[in-house]
Design a protein with these regions (language model features):
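Conserved hydrophobic positions within beta-strands
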Residues: 78-80
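Active-site gating/interface segments in enzymes
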Residues: 232-236, 240-248, 316-367
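Short, well-structured beta-strand-loop connectors
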Residues: 50-63, 82
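Ferredoxin-type iron-sulfur electron-transfer modules in oxidoreductases and energy-metabolism complexes
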Residues: 347-363, 373, 377-440
Length: 440
């Protein structure tokens, strides 16, 4: 039987061997913790503490700022030292709550947890929302909102994104290996919300051990299926995953719910389980630290707010001064100029690369080879769109579906002329979106 997949895509060296066999290690922070109030899509959270307040681990320090928002909790005990703008992983300055860690990790007394069997759908959604769970594999969309579509009866599929297709990142892989019960438990909780839905675990076939574990845990679950996907980037893209597992296609103007689907990644489903079954707020995540500049690549369970420099030190520091620092994956992540930034809800990895691993090539003229067209999972013509972008031709850019680009970088990866196709198209997309907002 042919493996499930999508059209286009590429096969970069995955680099996962550096960390895939490293068990998750818990790291306790030493210095101050910084909590940006914007760690999710939507309205920023509103601080509910003041400078000088003493807080406990698990205490809410910022409440949701609206329907599309999420609260933030202290991941250590200590004293609020400041509420002020602070550098975040994207390079911007965001209003943040700074807590001086007292090293005692005194925790709040969590309210008694209601048995899952006795919880209503509303109870489950409220538990997820109150815990501050957001999408931990992408842009950080508040999970309670995602699980509250207007017509829940039309949701046919709950898809667990277990692809982890970005090179070097192995955080989800280790989570699937070490705590698969919580992942399956998270899926079962979501299925409680959608009576007509079937659960799918979409796992790339380079993770046969995960496929085996998940099949064993779900063998008596008629509503859940484990699907092996062809290992190819960007298999973990939302559109590509939905197409591969269900055969349904969506575009940039649609939500997965429009195609009867809800997609959550591994870390998010585990957080859902912890929120509903254990009654714990979202306070930590697993982060991969890898790359050829890192002394001891590995996977680490860390509290939100920990300084990324501390996390790199937990991985033995850098054996060679890195030429490039990346937050997230090498394909869709972003470069960092400083490690003096916190781990947030959406921080999946920290990558450090030496100059030998960083491509530095001068772009030249397009040779019309068509490789970018073959690689594009959105079935676009990236070379043409990049030309329109470079000439600031918004009309032609939108006419030729430039807004359908998901900025996966496949086109730039295969381009023999080394043209910065993704960067040009991505910049133009931002301009178009900004102009559309002005017209509203």
């Amino acid at each position: 039987m042919a493996l499930l997949t999508f059209k286009g895509g590429i096969h970069p060296d995955d680099g996962k061997s550096l960390a895939k066999d490293k068990a998750i290690v818990e790291v306790k922070p030493k210095g101050n913790l910084v909590y940006p109030v914007s760690q999710h899509i939507g309205a920023p959270a509103n601080p509910v503490v003041a400078v000088g307040d003493h807080v406990l681990k698990g205490q809410m320090i910022a409440e949701a700022g609206g329907f599309v928002s999420a609260p933030i909790y202290a991941s250590v005990s200590g004293t609020v030292k400041a509420i002020a703008p602070h550098l975040n992983p994207t390079g911007g300055r965001v209003n943040s709550i700074v807590i001086e860690n007292d090293g005692e990790y005194k925790e709040v007394e969590y309210p008694a947890v209601t048995l899952l069997e006795e919880m209503s759908k509303e109870d489950i959604l409220n538990a997820i929302g109150t815990a501050g769970v957001v999408g931990m594999g992408g842009a950080g969309f508040p999970t309670k909102v995602k699980l509250s579509p207007k017509e829940p009866e039309k949701i046919d599929y709950i898809i667990a994104n277990c692809a982890e297709c970005e090179p070097y990142i192995t955080a989800d892989y280790r989570t699937m290996i070490e705590t698969p019960e919580k992942l399956v438990g998270g899926m079962k909780i979501i299925l409680r919300l959608f009576d007509n839905a079937k659960g799918i675990f979409g796992v790339e076939d380079n993770k046969p051990d995960c496929i085996e574990k998940l099949k064993e845990l779900t063998k008596d679950e008629p509503r859940i299926e484990v699907m092996a996907l062809k290992t190819k980037y960007p298999q973990g893209g939302e559109r590509q995953l939905i197409y591969a597992t269900t055969g349904r296609a969506i575009n940039s103007t649609m939500l997965p719910a429009d195609a009867g689907c809800v997609v959550d990644n591994v870390a998010t489903m585990v957080s859902i389980y912890q929120a509903v079954v254990e009654g714990k707020p979202s306070m930590e995540r697993v982060v991969t630290v890898s790359g050829d500049a890192v002394a001891e690549p590995g996977n680490f369970r860390v509290p939100f707010g920990i300084n990324q420099q501390e996390l790199v030190e937990a991985a033995g520091g850098f054996k060679t001064e890195p030429e490039k620092l990346i937050s997230g994956g090498p394909m869709m992540g972003f470069s960092m100029f400083s490690l003096d930034v916190p781990v947030t809800k959406t921080s999946s990895s920290i990558l450090g690369f030496t100059k030998d691993e960083v491509a530095k090539m001068e772009p030249s003229a397009c040779i019309n080879c068509g490789r970018c067209v073959e690689a594009c999972p959105s079935r676009l013509i990236p070379s043409r769109l990049a030309d329109y972008a470079e000439h600031h031709d918004e009309e032609k850019f939108t006419k030729h579906e430039g807004m359908e680009c998901m900025e996966c970088g496949s086109c730039s990866f295969v381009c023999p002329a080394k043209r910065p196709l993704k960067q040009a198209i991505g910049s133009m997309r931002k301009i178009v979106m900004a102009n559309r907002r002005k017209k509203k």
